[in-house]
Amino acid sequence: MSLSRRRFIQATGATLAASALPLQAQAAETPVALPIPPLLESRRGQPLFLTLQRLHWTFAAGRRAATWGINGGYLGPTVRVYNGDDVNIIYNNRLTEPVAMTVSGLQVPGTLMGGAARMMSPGADWSPVLPIRQTAGTCWYHANTPNRMAPHIYNGLAGLWLVEDAVSKVLPLPNHYGVDDFPLIIQDKRLDNFGQPVYNPPASGGFLGDTLLVNGAQSPFVEVSRGWVRLRLLNASNSRCYQLQLSDGRAMHVVAGDQGFLPAPVPVIRLSLAPGERREILIDMSKGEEVAITAGEAAGLMDRVRGFFEPSSILVNTTVLTLKPTGLLPLVTDNLPMRLLSDQLIDGGISRTREFSLGGSTPDINGALWNMSRNDFQSLQGSFERWIVHTNTPQAFHIQGVAFLIKRVNGNTPLPEDQGWKDTVWVDNEVELLVWFPQVAPDHFPYLYYSQTLEMADRGAAGQFVVRPQSVG
């Protein structure tokens, strides 16, 4: 029987459309195991080496791409330190341009925070000794290079930094790294037809890619035992905020935010993850059913075809990670703890109120662009301040060297999963924060606050402040 003209056009059109799909759309169909960054731990005063370098990585099946990374891999190893340690970090810049590094969420003096005051020229080192004096939390280390933070993080200069303490060691939570406790660094990129990342920042706003990567892989899977699985999430994207959920509609249990545990686990069906934000979740895999974490709706066929001809900000595939349970259910399984913190979150009297207006079309804060030689204000160590942050352009906001509680979101009580100590917050209109200043930052080593839309921060949406020590006597 002859093929009708209509069926011929339909068949050839579908074939052409499939062949025209961007490489990332085709590669996403190939299952790949979740890359798990090596674990780098502080032990007995031995230094931890972090080498910033060029390397090759496979972002799309069968295509090796030139990129950056740390210690030989795309992104960096997971650093794990312990409260009470003094950790000697040795950064070595083997790249061909200056780089500055920092650890977001770490409560250390401004002299040790990194950033513009600690630039590393090509071939240079920076080796701070960091006193770890804070409770358990999931921080992250990353490039903090003035005016170049966005491309440097996009290129791969980032990794997780875990702080453990006496409480986290004894809580009945999964804690076997790479077995039932996994780091997930989420990014969006744009890949060309050779699998090479492309970075073309927009004239305004932040960069949005069309390819979702987790630890540098598209739509990865991981095999897990039947029981509770712990995922430490970091949104290392330049500007995209994710709405995460499980493919079968079951609940995730949020146990921690940026700087520590929540008072108790919070079950959620949908979870927001802003740029720079970290969350820890538990997923019950005891039923032995495969489940995927997703980040919204994927692009349709025409969106994919259109993406072949022009840059797209619609994600081709929105699968973050597929969990595949293996083995038999253990005879004894741990129950989810009813409480995570024995004490209520403590806040103090407010010493003053500050207001911040984050720009949109103009990348400024309170009408001013970042100036390395200008400190915008000073605060007092140990004090609490009320910060009210406004914007007409939704974006994340980060503060170095502090911890804060979200008190109000657009006049309302924050969601239960947002009621722990944090350093990064999504701002869509207005948030009210109670900010605590645990460390000192002198004039020449101030802390930064900035838009976590990295392109906007690079253009000037940042400020800096000093923290004076409490007077004695």
Swiss-Prot record:
GO terms for biological process, alphabetical: FtsZ-dependent cytokinesis
Q: What are the alphabetically sorted keywords of the record?
A: Cell cycle, Cell division, Periplasm, Signal
CDD domains registered for this protein in UniProt: CuRO_2_CueO_FtsP
PTM notes? Predicted to be exported by the Tat system. The position of the signal peptide cleavage has not been experimentally proven.
The record's GO CC annotations read: cell division site; outer membrane-bounded periplasmic space
Question: Would you indicate the residue range of the signal peptide?
Answer: 1-27
Known function: Cell division protein that is required for growth during stress conditions. May be involved in protecting or stabilizing the divisomal assembly under conditions of stress.
Q: What name does UniProt use for this protein?
A: Cell division protein FtsP
Organism (species)? Sodalis glossinidius (strain morsitans)
